[in-house]
UniProtKB/Swiss-Prot annotation:
Functional summary from the UniProt entry: Recruits UPF2 at the cytoplasmic side of the nuclear envelope and the subsequent formation of an UPF1-UPF2-UPF3 surveillance complex (including UPF1 bound to release factors at the stalled ribosome) is believed to activate NMD. Binds spliced mRNA upstream of exon-exon junctions. Involved in nonsense-mediated decay (NMD) of mRNAs containing premature stop codons (premature termination codon PTC) by associating with the nuclear exon junction complex (EJC) and serving as link between the EJC core and NMD machinery. Eliminates the production of nonsense-containing RNAs (ncRNAs).
CDD domains: RRM_like_Smg4_UPF3 (cd12455)
Signal peptide: none
Sorted UniProt keywords: Cytoplasm, mRNA transport, Nonsense-mediated mRNA decay, Nucleus, Plant defense, RNA-binding, Transport
Annotated segments matching region Sufficient for association with EJC core: 53-482
The protein's name: Regulator of nonsense transcripts UPF3
Organism this protein belongs to: Arabidopsis thaliana (Mouse-ear cress)
Length: 482
């Protein structure tokens, strides 16, 4: 059975925080200098909040020395510089192990003077410092080295040699001739190859049909045209055809000789307007070249006729206004201004190309002849009942105003039924659409329009009926008034 291990290591606790190892040993050595073999001191930490005491570990050689040390230091009082007292406590250490002293020494200890790396370092330090040359000197040295040294030959791999040989065979004289022949062949093929979009003039068939103004015009052609929705092309005054997506209306009141072309599928139909149905002197349909040459003359004649029609309407209105009394003239001007706002707008608004306006009346171009027949029937009918505002005065005043209103309503009916309004610029408008017209109007016409504009009253204020001081009266309009 083993003997119990003898405890030789003690710990001294509760030492002052400011105590050093030298001060502690000065208290121990006078009496126990030769009795201990190992000492370890752990300094403390002094602070206002947490104060940590110092401690010391001492390992004695014999257990008797432990008893004697405990009898001497246990309860020993230490006083610091501030007068605080600290009572020491001697105990057995929890761990009795003590580090063993190492007797082995490192063989390299004290041999740095013989180390080769250290000796080379000393030589480098002993050499004088050399400044680097300037940049110009360095460039000159490099240029001299590059010029003197021979350039290394480029490395050629077998793959590069094979590619060079292949290019030489392809780009030889025979290869170049083959390439040129191939280029010529492609050019010839592209020249002989037909274009994907053949011209419409070559592919389409043209027919010339003479349009008659009588009631017996065959409606089968108009029905076919309206059902298939063809693209109309109207020739303008310069002889150029309008785009295919625009439509041109067939106008009965247009002057003779104006050519209208209609494209339906692959066939092109040219409509010619004849002056008189029963005229035996009508020339046969001419080819398109002769018709194009006469377009400019016909357009100038149509412009003159349109200008004369507009001037005649304005003069007629002025004469009627002068004959009637001021009250009648004011009512006439108001009614005329309400009914014919399109004529005033024709002279104020800028002109627009005929092809864009004609495109709006695409669906009504086939039924214009029927509408004109209805107008002729309405003119032949007996008297119609009209109303006119009644003012204080003689009975003949309502009659004249009723006549004027009847004329105005005839104009409204003609505009709503598709009658063409001719502007001074020579363009045609249908269905009362007078948004775009020419501004070319003489000084006389502008003054007359200003007079008409002054007498105009707002439609919102009137409410579409007679005012509070007017009375409604039904009058019979004579058939000769039209």
């Amino acid at each position: 059975m083993k003997e119990p291990l003898q405890k030789k290591k003690v710990v001294v606790r509760h030492l002052p925080p400011s105590l050093s190892q030298s001060d502690l040993l000065s208290q121990i050595d006078p009496r126990f200098a030769d009795r201990y073999n190992w000492v370890s001191f752990r300094p403390g930490k002094s602070s206002y909040k947490n104060q940590k005491y110092s401690r010391a570990y001492v390992s004695f050689k014999a257990p008797e020395d432990v008893y004697e040390f405990a009898a001497f230091f246990n309860g020993h009082v230490f006083v610091n510089e501030k007068g605080a007292q600290f009572k020491a406590i001697v105990e057995y250490a929890p761990s009795q192990r003590v580090p063993k002293p190492s007797d082995k020494k490192d063989p390299r200890e004290g041999s740095i003077s013989k180390d080769p790396d250290y000796l080379e370092f000393l030589k480098v330090i002993a050499q004088p410092v050399e400044n680097l040359p300037s940049a110009e000197i360095q460039l000159e040295r490099r240029e001299a080295e590059q010029s003197g040294a021979s350039k290394a030959a480029p490395i050629v791999t077998p793959l590069m040699e094979f590619i060079r040989q292949k290019r030489a065979t392809v780009m030889g004289p025979q290869g170049l001739s083959d390439i040129r022949r191939g280029g010529r062949r492609t050019r010839v093929v592209s020249a002989n190859k037909p274009s994907p979009r053949p011209s419409k003039r070559n592919s389409e068939k043209k027919k010339y049909v003479e349009k008659e103004s009588s009631k017996n015009v065959p409606r089968k052609t108009t029905a076919d045209v309206s059902s298939s929705k063809p693209d109309y092309r109207q020739s303008n005054s310069s002889g150029k055809e309008l785009p295919g997506n625009e439509t041109a209306a067939i106008i009965d009141s247009s002057p003779p000789g104006i050519a209208l072309t209609m494209d339906s599928g692959k066939k092109k139909i040219l409509l010619l307007r004849s002056k008189d149905r029963d005229n035996p002197d009508n020339p046969p349909p001419q080819p398109e070249q002769h018709i194009d040459t006469n377009l400019s003359r016909n357009s100038t004649d149509s412009r003159q006729n349109q200008k004369s029609d507009v001037g005649g309407r304005l003069i007629k209105g002025i004469l009627l206004r002068n004959d009637s009394r001021p009250s009648q003239s004011s009512t006439f001007v108001q009614s005329e201004q309400r009914v014919e706002p399109s004529e005033a707008e024709n002279y104020k608004r800028p002109s627009r190309p005929a092809n864009t306006r004609a495109g709006k009346d695409y669906h009504t171009s086939g039924t214009i002849s029927e509408k004109q027949e209805r107008r002729t029937r309405n003119k032949d009918r007996p008297d119609r009942v009209m109303w006119a505002p009644r003012r204080d005065g003689s009975e003949d005043q309502p009659l004249s105003s009723a006549g004027n209103n009847g004329e105005v309503k005839d104009r409204m009916f003609s505009q709503r039924s598709g009658e063409v309004v001719n502007s001074s610029g020579g363009h045609t408008l249908e269905n009362g659409s007078a948004r775009h017209s020419s501004r070319r109007v003489g000084g006389r016409n502008r003054k007359e329009e200003v007079v008409i504009g002054e007498g105009k009253t707002s439609r919102r204020g009137s409410g579409g009926g007679p005012s509070s001081h007017e009375k409604q009266m039904w009058i019979q309009k004579p058939s000769s008034g039209t």
